[in-house]
Structure formats: structure tokens, C-alpha cells
């Protein structure tokens, strides 16, 4: 039995050695292939973010997510311009409760409604 154990132990060691050499060989061909590709395409490994165009767009930042954001920003710009054009700074709202006498008279419409007329057809 001692001979069998001795025979098994060297076999296990050689199996472990084979795995180690396979790992080393697995790394070496990858490194060799990587070096070959770097030699073939030298400009690819230098920029770790993409093309110049992509980097410029990313640095610029995104202004609007979609057309809704664009339209809301456009409306805000118009609202900022209106008060500066000519607003009454003395106008205070909320202090006075309007009454029917304070409200201006309603303009009569030029087209008469069929419902408002007293004619029944």
C-alpha cells in the first residue's frame, strides 16, 4: 500500500503543477495577444473615455432631457422677461376682496346664443 500512496502523491503534484503551468500559459498568450493588438492599433489604448467628440459632449453637459424640458425652460425665460418689461411694484394682491360693484362691466357678445333667446322652435 505504501507504494500506491507514493505513486498517487507524485501524480497529484504533477496535476497541480500542470494547473499552475496552464494558468501561467493562459496569462502569457493573453499578454502576447494584447501586446500584438496594441502594436497594431496604438491609438486605441491612449484615450480611456472614447473619442474626442464624445468627451466634448460629456463635458458640455446635458441641457434638456426631452422636448418637455426644453419647452419648460423656454417658458421660464419668457416669464422672466415679462416682469422686467413693465410691472407695477405698488400693486398688492390679496388685500382687497372684490365685490360686484368693483368689477368692470361685462362686454356683451356680438353673437347671441340660441339658448339665451326666448324663441322655441
UniProtKB/Swiss-Prot annotation:
Tissues in which the UniProt entry reports expression: Present in striatum (at protein level).
The organism's taxonomic lineage, starting at the top: Eukaryota, Metazoa, Chordata, Craniata, Vertebrata
Main localisation: cytoplasm
Modified residues (N-acetylserine): 2
Single GO cellular component term: cytoplasm
Protein name: Alpha-endosulfine
Function of the molecule: Protein phosphatase inhibitor that specifically inhibits protein phosphatase 2A (PP2A) during mitosis. When phosphorylated at Ser-67 during mitosis, specifically interacts with PPP2R2D (PR55-delta) and inhibits its activity, leading to inactivation of PP2A, an essential condition to keep cyclin-B1-CDK1 activity high during M phase. Also acts as a stimulator of insulin secretion by interacting with sulfonylurea receptor (ABCC8), thereby preventing sulfonylurea from binding to its receptor and reducing K(ATP) channel currents.
InterPro entries, sorted: Endosulphine
Phosphoserine: modified positions: 2, 43, 67, 108-109
GO terms (BP aspect): cell division; G2/M transition of mitotic cell cycle; mitotic cell cycle; regulation of insulin secretion
Basic and acidic residues: compositionally biased ranges: 16-37
Region named Disordered: 1-53, 79-121
Family of this protein: Belongs to the endosulfine family.
Keyword Nucleotide-binding: no
Modified residues (Phosphothreonine): 21
A molecular function GO annotation: phosphatase inhibitor activity
Organism in which the protein naturally occurs: Mus musculus (Mouse)
Amino acid at each position: 500500500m505504501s507504494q500506491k500512496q507514493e505513486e498517487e502523491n507524485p501524480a497529484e503534484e504533477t496535476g497541480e503543477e500542470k494547473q499552475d503551468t496552464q494558468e501561467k500559459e493562459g496569462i502569457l498568450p493573453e499578454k502576447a495577444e494584447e501586446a500584438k493588438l496594441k502594436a497594431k492599433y496604438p491609438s486605441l489604448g491612449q484615450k480611456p473615455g472614447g473619442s474626442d467628440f464624445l468627451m466634448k459632449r460629456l463635458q458640455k453637459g446635458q441641457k434638456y432631457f426631452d422636448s418637455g424640458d426644453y419647452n419648460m425652460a423656454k417658458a421660464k425665460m419668457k416669464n422672466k422677461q415679462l416682469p422686467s418689461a413693465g410691472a407695477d411694484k405698488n400693486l398688492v394682491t390679496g388685500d382687497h376682496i372684490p365685490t360686484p360693484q368693483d368689477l368692470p362691466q361685462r362686454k356683451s357678445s356680438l353673437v347671441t346664443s340660441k339658448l339665451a333667446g326666448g324663441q322655441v322652435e
